[in-house]
C-alpha cells in the first residue's frame, strides 16, 4: 500500500506505470487510520516540517510500521542555523506558499510553515518516550543538495567546491538528515 498527499493527484497520469497495482490513500500523518504494524515500511521525504506537530507524525509512522521507518528531513546543524540568519535558507518556508496565499505551507493552508530541523538526539529521545521497552536501532546519514545548484557564476562555483570539501570533513553539518528506524533489530530494554 502507498499513502500519498493529495497533491499527488496531479502527477498520477505522469507516473501511471509506477503506480499500477498500488493502493493509494489520502492520509493525514498526524492521525493515520491504519492498524498498528499494518505496513512493512513507512517512508516520508520533506513532509513533516509542513505539519503543526511533526513529533506526532513520527509517532504515527512508528506505530503503523512493522519493520522500519525512513524519514528524510532538514538537519538542525550550526551551518543551517547560520544559513537562516544570513537568509541563505528559510526559517519559515515562504517559498512553499502559492502567490495568492491560498495553498501550500502549514497544513496546506497558505501560511508559511516553520522548517522544523531535526537532530540525532531529538529522534533518540522521541523514540525512548514512544517505546521505552525497546532499544531501537537508528541509522543516521547526512547529505546536502548543493549539487542541484547550477550556476555559471565563478563565485558560486568556488563556494560549492569549498562546501564539498568542508562537508567531507564535517558530514553532520550538511542540510539533509536521513533517519532509518530499524524495528527488526530492536532490543528489549526492560
Regions inferred by a protein language model and the residue ranges of each:
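Class I SAM-dependent methyltransferase SAM/SAH-binding core
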Residues: 1-31
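A conserved beta-strand element that flanks and buttresses the S-adenosyl-L-methionine
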Residues: 43
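Active-site recognition of the HExxH zinc-binding catalytic motif
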Residues: 47-50
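A short glycine-rich, Lys/Arg-flanked "PGG" loop and its adjoining helix->strand segment in the class I
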Residues: 55-69
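Conserved class I S-adenosyl-L-methionine
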Residues: 67-100
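Short alpha-helix
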Residues: 112-141
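Conserved Class I S-adenosyl-L-methionine
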Residues: 139-190
Amino acid at each position: 500500500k502507498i499513502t500519498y498527499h493529495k497533491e499527488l493527484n496531479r502527477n498520477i497520469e505522469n507516473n501511471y506505470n509506477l503506480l499500477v497495482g498500488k493502493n493509494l490513500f489520502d492520509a493525514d500523518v498526524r492521525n493515520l487510520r491504519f492498524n498498528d504494524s499494518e505496513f512493512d515500511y513507512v517512508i516520508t521525504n520533506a513532509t513533516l516540517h509542513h505539519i503543526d506537530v511533526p513529533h506526532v507524525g513520527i509517532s504515527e509512522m512508528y506505530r503503523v510500521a512493522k519493520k522500519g521507518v525512513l524519514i528524510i528531513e532538514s538537519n538542525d546543524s550550526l551551518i543551517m542555523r547560520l544559513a537562516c540568519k544570513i537568509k541563505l535558507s528559510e526559517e519559515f518556508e515562504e517559498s512553499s506558499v502559492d502567490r495568492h496565499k491560498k495553498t501550500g505551507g502549514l497544513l496546506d493552508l497558505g501560511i508559511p510553515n516553520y522548517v522544523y530541523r531535526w537532530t540525532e538526539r531529538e529522534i533518540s529521545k522521541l523514540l525512548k518516550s514512544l517505546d521505552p521497552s525497546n532499544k531501537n536501532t537508528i541509522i543516521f546519514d547526512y547529505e546536502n543538495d548543493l549539487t542541484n545548484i547550477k550556476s555559471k557564476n565563478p563565485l558560486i562555483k568556488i563556494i560549492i567546491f569549498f562546501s564539498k570539501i568542508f562537508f567531507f570533513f564535517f558530514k553532520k553539518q550538511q542540510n539533509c538528515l536521513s533517519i532509518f528506524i530499524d524495528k527488526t533489530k530492536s532490543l528489549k530494554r526492560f
